[in-house]
């Protein structure tokens, strides 16, 4: 009996050590799975402004976008000397006095995706100048570890694009709009919080809280939601960053006299529409008299592979194309004053 009592504390310590190691390495697996940046751009790498087709899982949806194709663009590189990063971008310039709009794609996507090419094309046809960039770890931009940071580092890429338009092209801050999709919307929202001169922003399917996203993804794949705590710890230990530390709600709360449009799908399974509503509610509470907030819940889903694969995430520009185009024209036309 005394022998059992003597070894009991050691067994407890061993159990706790094994449990802690399991917790950390399970968290590491979840963190790296959640933060991993797939390099396939959802099968859209062959797209170019002069010819692009909408694809999900590499399968075309059947939507004819040929009326929106555009030429006369060029590729540039934005150099971030502090981080030694190269950010690839396409620009298409309108008339000398035309306002600019910066377009930022989502997770695992790139500037070749219809989710940014189509709305950019809509604005090109209205006379705007546009920039479409690849976030770090995506597309033709610099790769470090193929992990995203939920917008916390990616917002620097957004700010680099915005400042290039402002400083290199000499465009007044009030003539520059920004458009972000999903992860890109989160990065844009954080950039909106950092740069008070950024005046007009459109967010498509933004997330409001990264911890909620990780928890919902765990549940979607059959894992207990409490494992998100292990993922948070692993991000700090192995990635050197807490991807849940900052929230795009910071951007919504910093709106003041600026302008924000939030579009979110009612049937979005990846970023549930409650996130868009949280962003909308926060912005409305922080709005000042000269600012504006518009919130729109879109309908519909996209099915490919004979209905075997379906998504409601970032599909509004396809399912409600005419309305999407008109609302973009109205929002940016009012906030950037296209016509002098």
Mark where each language-model region is.
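Alpha/beta-hydrolase active-site loop
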Residues: 148-169
């Amino acid at each position: 009996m005394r022998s059992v009592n003597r070894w009991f504390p050691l067994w407890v310590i061993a159990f706790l050590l094994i449990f802690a190691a399991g917790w950390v390495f399970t968290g590491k697996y979840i963190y790296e799975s959640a933060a991993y940046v797939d390099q396939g751009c959802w099968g859209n790498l062959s797209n170019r402004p002069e010819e692009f087709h909408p694809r999900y899982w590499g399968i075309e949806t059947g939507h004819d976008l040929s009326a929106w194709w555009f030429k006369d663009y060029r590729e540039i590189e934005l150099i971030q000397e502090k981080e030694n990063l190269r950010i690839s971008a396409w620009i298409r310039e309108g008339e000398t006095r035309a306002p600019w709009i910066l377009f930022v794609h989502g997770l695992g996507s790139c500037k070749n995706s219809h989710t940014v090419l189509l709305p950019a094309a809509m604005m090109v046809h209205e006379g705007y100048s546009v920039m479409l960039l690849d976030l770090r770890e995506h597309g033709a931009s610099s790769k470090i570890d193929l992990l995203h940071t939920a917008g916390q580092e990616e917002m620097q890429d957004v700010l680099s694009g915005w400042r290039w338009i402002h400083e290199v092209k000499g465009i007044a801050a009030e003539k520059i709009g920004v458009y972000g999709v999903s992860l890109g919307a989160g990065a844009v929202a954080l950039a909106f919080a950092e740069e008070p001169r950024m005046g007009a922003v459109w967010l498509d399917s933004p997330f409001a809280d990264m911890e909620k996203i990780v928890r919902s993804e765990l549940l979607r794949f059959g894992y207990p939601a409490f494992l998100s705590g292990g993922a948070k710890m692993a991000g700090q230990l192995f990635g050197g960053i807490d991807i849940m530390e900052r929230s795009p709600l910071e951007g919504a709360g910093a709106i003041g006299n600026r302008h924000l449009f939030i579009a979110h799908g009612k049937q979005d399974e990846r970023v549930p529409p409650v996130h868009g509503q949280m962003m909308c509610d926060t912005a409305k509470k922080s709005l000042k008299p000269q600012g504006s907030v518009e919130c729109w819940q879109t309908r519909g889903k996209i099915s490919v592979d004979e209905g075997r694969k379906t998504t409601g995430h970032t599909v509004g520009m396809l399912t409600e194309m005419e309305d999407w185009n008109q609302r973009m024209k109205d929002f940016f036309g009012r906030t950037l004053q296209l016509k002098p």
